[in-house]
Amino acid sequence: MEKVIPVHLPHQSYAVVIASGGLGQMGDYLQHQAHLKPGQKVLVVSNPLIFKHYGEKVLVSLQRAGFATSTCLLPAGERYKTLKSVQQIYDCALEQRLERSSTILALGGGVIGDMAGFAAATWLRGINVVQVPTTLLAMVDAAIGGKTGVNHPQGKNLIGAFHQPRLVLIDPDTLKTLPGREFRAALAEVIKYGVIWDGNLFQKLEAAERLDQYRTLSPQLLADLLVHSCQAKVDVVTKDEKEAGLRAILNYGHTIGHGIESLTNYRKFNHGEAVGLGMVAVGQLAVDLGFWSQEECDRQFSLIQKAHLPTHIPADLDLNLLIDSLQTDKKVQAGQVRFIVPTAIGAVTITDQIPTPAIVHVLKQMQKG
């Protein structure tokens, strides 16, 4: 399959290309979709495991097309998403004498994409970045839209920049080597798109016999899942590139989810699992406060269960610290925490009128499981 989704922005337009076998044609895509020229330098940023699977295929294709290649390998995992890791990319960029016309190619999941994108945004005040996501989570979320950054000890993604890629190349074949837990976690973001934007996608997920493993998805469902999710992200980003308003809806489930991630030191739950927990919490909050029906909330809960995602939080998680952590969320305005709240399957609203006692009540219920 090959599907090209155009992203039209005021200052830079690009394509999201979904292509089976695309990694082996990387050089061609850089020339014809990213409009880069042979002879230019490309620094491939990855982690050792991903590079072991796909690095040679990418390098051979780039070299065959005439690009001057080099590599920078970083440790894998959210806890390495730091300025220290970005410094390693800077060191590689300096060693390879990257120029304004050079490109950083992010080959990996969301952590690699965020760090490589931030390095590209800040090296020489901005050079090209090409996003080549190899995880489902990065394919449907992190690689599209130009958000880049790293974590601060006090919160997730507090240091960053908007820096749009020259190209996003998604090769679904890389999902064959994705661990099952990572695949399931990414489904939280896919379900999110169904709740906030695309009711048709939500219904397709409901109709699927199983969602918990890559190999149980039909090729058609996988294609639908990728295309619908990417199109939803592109639709929102096109309307609001810098998160001035509408784009904030993409953070559904993230406000509480980021707090859970941070307070469990990014070790107990991965990002998608934490987002799923945030969706469970806000979904029930939306019922309690009259935003949507219990039936719609139950449909969301059932899909999250169908993806074999966690639905309860640890009994020993300090809820006072979790409530405090919400104040460091990027969506806080004038000291008020803004929540993305569902009003129907396929529609949400943004509100800062969520009483803290209501949040605590829902979280306590989630601890009882």
Curated annotation (Swiss-Prot):
Catalyses which reaction(s): 7-phospho-2-dehydro-3-deoxy-D-arabino-heptonate = 3-dehydroquinate + phosphate
Keywords: Amino-acid biosynthesis, Aromatic amino acid biosynthesis, Cobalt, Cytoplasm, Lyase, Metal-binding, NAD, Nucleotide-binding, Zinc
Keyword Iron-sulfur in record: no
Molecular-function annotations in GO: 3-dehydroquinate synthase activity; metal ion binding; nucleotide binding
EC numbers: 4.2.3.4
Compartments (UniProt record): Cytoplasm
UniProt record, GO biological process: amino acid biosynthetic process; aromatic amino acid family biosynthetic process; chorismate biosynthetic process
Highest taxon, organism lineage: Bacteria
Record pathway: Metabolic intermediate biosynthesis; chorismate biosynthesis; chorismate from D-erythrose 4-phosphate and phosphoenolpyruvate: step 2/7
Cofactors, names only: Co(2+); Zn(2+); NAD(+)
Residue pairs linked by disulfide bridges in the UniProt entry: none
Record flagged with keyword Amino-acid biosynthesis: yes
Signal peptide coordinates: none
A Pfam family recorded for this sequence: DHQS_C
InterPro entries: Dehydroquinate_synthase, DHQ_synth_AroB, DHQ_synth_fam, DHQS/DOIS_N, DHQS_C
Cofactor details (free text): Binds 1 divalent metal cation per subunit. Can use either Co(2+) or Zn(2+).
Amino acids binding Zn(2+): E189, H254, H271
A GO CC annotation given for this chain: cytoplasm
Binding site for NAD(+): G110, V111, I112, G113, D114, T134, T135, K147, K156, T174, L175, K176, T177
NCBIfam families registered for this protein in UniProt: aroB
Function (record text): Catalyzes the conversion of 3-deoxy-D-arabino-heptulosonate 7-phosphate (DAHP) to dehydroquinate (DHQ).
PANTHER family: 3-DEHYDROQUINATE SYNTHASE, 3-DEHYDROQUINATE SYNTHASE, CHLOROPLASTIC
Similarity comment: family membership: Belongs to the sugar phosphate cyclases superfamily. Dehydroquinate synthase family.
Protein name per its UniProtKB record: 3-dehydroquinate synthase
Source species of the chain: Cyanothece sp. (strain PCC 7425 / ATCC 29141)
